[in-house]
Amino acid sequence: TKSFKGEARMEGRVILVTERAQKTVVGQFHCGPQYNYVMPFDQRIPFEIVIPHGQEFPDVEAGYPKPPAQVGPAQESVEPTAIPTLSEGVNPMQVVPTRDPLTPGPSPPRERGGLISPGTLSRHRQFGGESEGRSAVAPASRRQNARDLDELIVDVEITTYPRPAALPRGRVLEVLGRREEFGVDVEIMIRKFHLPHRFPPDVVAEASAAPQYIPERDPALRDRRDFRGLPIVTIDGETAKDFDDAVYVERLAWGNYLLHVHIADVAHYVRPGSALDREARLRGTSVYFPDRAVPMLPLELSSGICSLNPHVDRLVMSALLEFDPEGRLVEYELLPGIIRSAERMTYTAVRDILAGEPAACQRYAALIPNFKLMEELARLLARRREDRGSIDFDLPEPEIEFDEHGRMTGITRSERNFAHRIIEEFMLAANEAVASYLEGKGIPSLYRIHEKPDVKKVIEFEEIAATFGYSLGIELPPARRARLRLRDERDRYPRFHEAFEGELKISPYNYQRLAQRLEGKPEERILSYLMLRSLKQARYSEENVGHFALAAPTYTHFTSPIRRYPDLIVHRILKAALAQEGGSARTIREQGTGNREQGIGNRIRGEGLRAPANPVRERDARATAGETPAPQLPGAAFVHPEELHALGLETSESERHAAEAERELMEWKKVSFMAQHVGDEFEALIIGLIKQGFFVELTDLFVEGFVPLSNLGDDSYVYHERLRAIIGQHSKRAFRLGERTRVCLVRIDRSENKLEFSVAE
């Protein structure tokens, strides 16, 4: 126990791990002189896992390993298995074409490196980029010995945990292939981060029972606004397969803009407590890897009936937002609807249209006026966000390039054009409107919150920024520093505790103004990166504390229910709230300009669109006539605050987990790509300094690596923390944070996925 001025906390050391939350570990199999073992990829497991004789190969049923709960000791009849290689006819690069998920008929099997029985595969395991449940198990005639597993990647179940002087033991559940084979890195990440990647039979059954189209006389349409006559479009990336959102903008007669944001009504098909719902909650989010994805929902829904595909009817939850010519929100309406997307647009195509590219303009001539209105409104909304202090870090993100065979060919900066900003602004506006409505009604909901930064993080950033001549322009609270008295004397260096008096007075404006000052400067990249690191992570919570980075008093996630479980929860709550109000809700925020005699819920929008019905009046009329009212908004459900609290914790953890898996796979692919560049020189930015050396980021490839002091052979270098520099004792040559230098790649550490550089002379 440690205490300081009445503040106490418990500290200790982990002595022995008696059991792990996850019993499976992925690693590389090694044949040793005394025993066979697996070296885990998870660096938190620093020991080998011994694989006893007879446990080297999976128990197999129809080509799949048994689940861990069913795996027993190896049967005597199961002999060691030889692993098929490329020379034996198994081609890991081959991708068998799959059918469209809406086309009847069986799915062809898809395999990478495994001999899998076609009859055991569901569509979910081989369409849409999901893991196929690989198991490289060959027929009995080709079984040989455990040496065929040497250097292969396997997934093992821990059967005996480590004890003093005794290594843990385990058995092989799956053989994934060789590390360098196509797709094996994704399989490793899926298992390392324990991402659910096979839909259980009850989930498959529910997904298969989902309708493929919406009947014209579907009772669900009676209480929905009909938007099928409007040229509504989706705008997504070129490789997107699921479309959550569709948009449309029109100019009203009095000069205001009317923004339509239509979001897939996933709650209509994924009901609370169903097998689909339980699996979606378990996954929490879709996980996107560079070459494929692990979806939250089966493809019959995510790419089928829920996806806002072009030229087909789809159920939606709609947000209609009216903005005045200054971009102020004056009124909004939330309601269920039905749309028929006119076109599946890409960011690139919209960019070309806005730039006046002839081919794009000719192809989409009928939609050009609408895209021009979208551009106008998005610029107004961006300016309004900037005026209130919203922070926008335009940091480059890497994008992996592949050839037609799936081989990685390069790393480039992902393009971010104004078409991305259009969708971003429209989704932000819809999310804020939904959050504002639910909070205004006092309805418990799930918010997307971003708290103020921690004072220590801000102080650390201020100290670094000062070396560049910059500051956030804030007044730091006074600090008290005291040395901790430790009972455990094994700590070599004294440790201190700092306490700050008073609250840190900081606002998004401080960050925004500094970001604007840095724009175009040499130090922009490094200081923007450090500013971002000083902020807390956004998360989900039932308690609304606002969103610091967006400078928004209330915010939620509503616009991506196909790939995020919190959005699905918000849809259910919103539908339950709207059902109490007769099916829709209209809110006036500010008194705008122009004709205010009619609300947006009573206007006819667009040629060919019928005047919207009044669902309350229709329901009352049906009741008066003795007709039983139709069910109101299927999938609607309020959620208890205690359950919302649990959901906030679960979904925030799922999001972090997915981000870690995506980030680590990107590092794996970068290291694999750089293997062919050992000895090459690169321009680099110094992004971090420690006593042992400095970290660099390659300017053109967005690849990070380390330059150890031992590789600086021209002098004896010392790290000066106060100066944020590494300086040669004799030459006085300095390497400072944010400076650019030229480096040479000298070594790749595959086991830890690290790159080592030296300074190029």
Regions found by a protein language model. Give the residues of each.
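Short helix/loop capping segments that flank catalytic or ligand/cofactor-binding pockets
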Residues: 47-49, 165-167, 180-184, 243-245, ...
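Arg/Gly-rich low-complexity intrinsically disordered repeat tracts
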Residues: 100, 110, 128, 589-603, ...
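Short acidic-glycine loop/turn motifs at beta-strand connectors
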Residues: 32, 252-253, 323-328, 402-405
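Charge-lined substrate channels and their catalytic hotspots, especially those that engage the 3′ end
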Residues: 1-100, 108, 115-260, 267-312, ...
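Append "with occasional cross-activation on large, charged helical scaffolds in nucleic-acid assemblies
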Residues: 334, 347-589, 616, 631-702, ...
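Covalent nucleotidyltransferase
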Residues: 293-352, 373, 545, 550-553
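A generic structural signal for residues embedded in beta-strands
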Residues: 1-2, 156, 689, 743-745
